């Protein structure tokens, strides 16, 4: 494993040293490092820990004006895994673009937003219900500067983008977003998405922490005899100068195989959602990249060390997962982000998670966390 990591790191370094931009080719190289420290527990902070949450390197580019690519590898946890490994053909009919490879399915604004730019250290609780990267093909297009459509077919894959199983677990995921306002420092983003996921292995399971990646899983569910899973989501984001609001809701329907004795289909529904608010004390505004990427880099008005202290952002969020008779989890998160410059950020989060099991018994977990983040 060490030899593999060293080899890949050497290749990526060589790519960095040979970055080039010509009339035919544009090549970029970059990466990110995120180091987390946390203390958490039920009532008191009984546990402490630290980890490199993400250590990634990537290369992306464009060739001859019609072909794009991205290669991104993650080295956190002492192992290598594929993140984005895709190729894309542009300038197809209806202003279309065809992407093939291993990448995020087009579902949910927060899930599509890069971890470099999310407001809190961890995404809200609905991430446990959201498919992220899988292997497949996606067609995406836009109609003017307001309406954006994405649709793809995917297969569940391993950490290297491979799907060698014969169970034919195929998903179709589609999303539409509308940029109702995008003028000056004001923005209103609206979106809906759907993902229908065939389950030939007849099982469905998930688990979730209380938005503390170092903490323990607090809730889980495991369903047998599942035919397919259907996810419907709605999303909204509003920016007005230094203030921003964002919310999403998901309805996950687990469709079970018809009961032989009762001869009807049994559905189980899970509702998950979050709402958040943030405010820049130093007057900056969130920047919007695109429908597929969400929000982008924050550029402080004055960088730290350059006659300034950077940018400071206060944020709060409430999120929940309701599994009906199987229990629920609710989180309250407050955060302070310090942007020293456009590429360096220090984050402070406090999370209070409240879990109710199927018997109604309550467990509360508190966590304080800090992240030091650098991307290049």
What does each model-found stretch correspond to?
Residues 1-23:
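Bacterial Sec-dependent N-terminal signal peptides
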Residues 5-6, 28, 251:
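Intrinsically disordered, low-complexity segments enriched in glycine/proline and serine/threonine
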Residues 9, 108-109, 255, 356:
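Active-site-proximal flexible loops/turns
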Residues 10-13, 50, 307, 337:
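Generic structural signal for beta-strand residues in well-ordered domains
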Residues 18-19, 117, 161, 257, ...:
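Residue-level signature of transmembrane alpha-helix interfaces in integral membrane proteins
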Residues 22-159, 164-200, 236, 274-284, ...:
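Outer membrane beta-barrel
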Residues 43-45, 89, 205-376:
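Outer-membrane beta-barrel pore domains
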